[in-house]
Amino acid sequence: SSLDELSGLPNIVYLDRGESYEDDRLRVNAFGSTDMGVSYLVTAEGKTIFHAGDLNNWHWRDESTEEEVREAETAYLSELYYMKRTIKSIDVAMFPVDARLGKDYMRGAEQFVGEFNVGMFVPMHFYPVVRKAESFAPIAKRYGTEFVLLSSTGDSVII
Protein backbone atom coordinates (compact mmCIF):
# COMPACT_ATOMS: atom_id res chain seq x y z
CA SER A 1 0.00 0.00 0.00
CA SER A 2 1.02 3.62 -0.30
CA LEU A 3 1.34 3.86 3.50
CA ASP A 4 3.83 1.01 3.47
CA GLU A 5 5.87 2.87 0.84
CA LEU A 6 5.92 6.01 2.98
CA SER A 7 6.82 4.24 6.22
CA GLY A 8 10.49 4.01 5.31
CA LEU A 9 10.86 7.70 4.53
CA PRO A 10 12.46 10.05 7.06
CA ASN A 11 10.45 12.81 8.78
CA ILE A 12 7.08 11.09 8.50
CA VAL A 13 4.99 10.70 11.63
CA TYR A 14 1.83 8.58 11.79
CA LEU A 15 -0.75 9.51 14.41
CA ASP A 16 -3.86 7.71 15.54
CA ARG A 17 -6.70 9.17 17.59
CA GLY A 18 -5.37 10.29 20.96
CA GLU A 19 -1.74 10.50 19.87
CA SER A 20 0.33 13.64 19.48
CA TYR A 21 3.60 14.81 18.00
CA GLU A 22 5.66 17.76 19.12
CA ASP A 23 8.93 19.30 18.03
CA ASP A 24 10.51 22.72 18.58
CA ARG A 25 8.14 24.38 16.06
CA LEU A 26 4.72 22.77 16.42
CA ARG A 27 2.43 20.37 18.21
CA VAL A 28 -0.06 18.08 16.45
CA ASN A 29 -2.91 16.35 18.30
CA ALA A 30 -4.85 13.66 16.45
CA PHE A 31 -8.56 13.24 17.07
CA GLY A 32 -11.04 10.82 15.62
CA SER A 33 -13.11 10.88 12.48
CA THR A 34 -16.61 9.72 11.73
CA ASP A 35 -15.38 8.36 8.39
CA MET A 36 -11.81 7.76 7.20
CA GLY A 37 -8.59 8.71 8.97
CA VAL A 38 -8.28 11.25 11.75
CA SER A 39 -8.71 14.96 12.36
CA TYR A 40 -5.86 17.19 13.53
CA LEU A 41 -5.27 20.18 15.76
CA VAL A 42 -1.98 21.90 14.91
CA THR A 43 -0.55 24.45 17.33
CA ALA A 44 2.28 26.64 16.06
CA GLU A 45 3.44 30.17 16.84
CA GLY A 46 0.61 30.59 19.32
CA LYS A 47 -2.10 29.73 16.77
CA THR A 48 -4.36 26.70 16.61
CA ILE A 49 -5.48 25.25 13.29
CA PHE A 50 -7.98 22.41 13.11
CA HIS A 51 -8.32 20.22 10.02
CA ALA A 52 -11.41 18.04 10.32
CA GLY A 53 -10.50 15.60 7.58
CA ASP A 54 -13.67 13.50 7.34
CA LEU A 55 -14.97 14.34 10.81
CA ASN A 56 -18.57 15.46 10.37
CA ASN A 57 -22.15 14.59 11.24
CA TRP A 58 -22.33 12.31 8.20
CA HIS A 59 -25.91 11.29 7.70
CA TRP A 60 -28.20 11.45 4.75
CA ARG A 61 -31.51 12.26 6.43
CA ASP A 62 -33.25 12.13 3.05
CA GLU A 63 -32.08 8.53 2.53
CA SER A 64 -31.33 7.12 5.99
CA THR A 65 -33.52 5.56 8.63
CA GLU A 66 -34.07 7.49 11.86
CA GLU A 67 -31.85 4.96 13.62
CA GLU A 68 -29.00 5.53 11.14
CA VAL A 69 -29.34 9.29 11.57
CA ARG A 70 -29.28 8.90 15.37
CA GLU A 71 -26.21 6.64 15.22
CA ALA A 72 -24.33 9.09 12.98
CA GLU A 73 -25.22 12.02 15.22
CA THR A 74 -24.24 10.14 18.38
CA ALA A 75 -20.86 9.15 16.92
CA TYR A 76 -20.18 12.73 15.85
CA LEU A 77 -21.24 14.37 19.10
CA SER A 78 -19.23 11.80 21.08
CA GLU A 79 -16.10 12.81 19.19
CA LEU A 80 -16.79 16.51 19.82
CA TYR A 81 -17.18 15.73 23.53
CA TYR A 82 -13.84 13.87 23.48
CA MET A 83 -12.17 16.82 21.72
CA LYS A 84 -13.51 19.36 24.21
CA ARG A 85 -11.36 17.76 26.90
CA THR A 86 -8.30 19.08 25.05
CA ILE A 87 -9.44 21.98 22.87
CA LYS A 88 -10.43 25.31 24.40
CA SER A 89 -10.45 27.49 21.31
CA ILE A 90 -9.51 27.25 17.64
CA ASP A 91 -8.08 30.09 15.57
CA VAL A 92 -8.86 28.46 12.21
CA ALA A 93 -11.10 25.46 11.56
CA MET A 94 -11.24 23.74 8.18
CA PHE A 95 -14.42 21.72 8.22
CA PRO A 96 -16.72 19.90 5.74
CA VAL A 97 -19.79 21.69 4.38
CA ASP A 98 -20.82 18.96 1.96
CA ALA A 99 -24.06 19.50 0.02
CA ARG A 100 -24.20 15.79 -0.87
CA LEU A 101 -25.71 15.28 2.60
CA GLY A 102 -28.96 16.89 1.48
CA LYS A 103 -31.01 19.27 3.56
CA ASP A 104 -28.92 18.87 6.74
CA TYR A 105 -25.57 19.44 5.02
CA MET A 106 -24.58 22.29 7.39
CA ARG A 107 -25.69 20.56 10.61
CA GLY A 108 -22.28 19.16 11.60
CA ALA A 109 -20.53 22.46 10.88
CA GLU A 110 -23.05 24.39 12.98
CA GLN A 111 -22.70 21.91 15.84
CA PHE A 112 -18.93 22.33 15.61
CA VAL A 113 -18.88 26.15 15.78
CA GLY A 114 -21.50 25.93 18.52
CA GLU A 115 -19.24 23.73 20.66
CA PHE A 116 -15.89 25.46 20.16
CA ASN A 117 -14.76 29.07 20.20
CA VAL A 118 -13.74 29.25 16.52
CA GLY A 119 -12.11 32.44 15.25
CA MET A 120 -12.21 31.61 11.54
CA PHE A 121 -14.17 28.93 9.69
CA VAL A 122 -12.95 27.68 6.31
CA PRO A 123 -15.36 25.26 4.60
CA MET A 124 -14.12 22.24 2.68
CA HIS A 125 -15.61 19.25 0.81
CA PHE A 126 -17.97 21.57 -1.08
CA TYR A 127 -16.51 21.67 -4.59
CA PRO A 128 -18.00 22.25 -7.13
CA VAL A 129 -21.10 23.67 -5.37
CA VAL A 130 -19.50 26.86 -4.00
CA ARG A 131 -22.80 28.63 -3.30
CA LYS A 132 -23.78 25.87 -0.87
CA ALA A 133 -20.61 26.50 1.15
CA GLU A 134 -21.29 30.25 1.10
CA SER A 135 -24.66 29.55 2.74
CA PHE A 136 -22.82 28.78 5.97
CA ALA A 137 -21.49 32.36 6.29
CA PRO A 138 -24.50 33.75 8.22
CA ILE A 139 -24.46 30.76 10.58
CA ALA A 140 -20.77 31.29 11.33
CA LYS A 141 -21.44 34.98 11.95
CA ARG A 142 -24.23 34.13 14.40
CA TYR A 143 -21.62 32.27 16.48
CA GLY A 144 -19.12 35.14 16.26
CA THR A 145 -16.94 33.23 13.78
CA GLU A 146 -15.37 34.78 10.70
CA PHE A 147 -16.22 32.87 7.51
CA VAL A 148 -13.52 32.59 4.83
CA LEU A 149 -14.16 30.80 1.54
CA LEU A 150 -11.09 29.47 -0.27
CA SER A 151 -12.59 28.26 -3.53
CA SER A 152 -9.81 28.51 -6.11
CA THR A 153 -6.44 26.83 -6.39
CA GLY A 154 -3.85 29.02 -4.71
CA ASP A 155 -6.30 30.90 -2.47
CA SER A 156 -4.82 31.67 0.93
CA VAL A 157 -5.58 33.50 4.14
CA ILE A 158 -3.36 35.13 6.74
CA ILE A 159 -4.18 34.22 10.32
Predicted regions and their residues:
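Active-site metal-binding motif and surrounding structural segment of the metallo-beta-lactamase
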Residues: 1-5, 82-94
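Active-site neighborhood of phospho(di)ester-bond hydrolases with catalytic His/Asp-centered motifs
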Residues: 1, 50-53, 70-71, 92-98, ...
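Binuclear metal-ion centers of metallo-dependent hydrolases, dominated by the metallo-beta-lactamase
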Residues: 10-19, 101, 105-159
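Short acidic/polar alpha-helix capping motifs at helix-coil junctions
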Residues: 4-6, 72-77, 143-146
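Active-site-proximal segments of metal-dependent phosphoesterases and phosphodiesterases across multiple
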Residues: 65-75, 86, 92-114
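Core dinuclear metal-dependent hydrolase active-site scaffold
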Residues: 11-89, 152-159
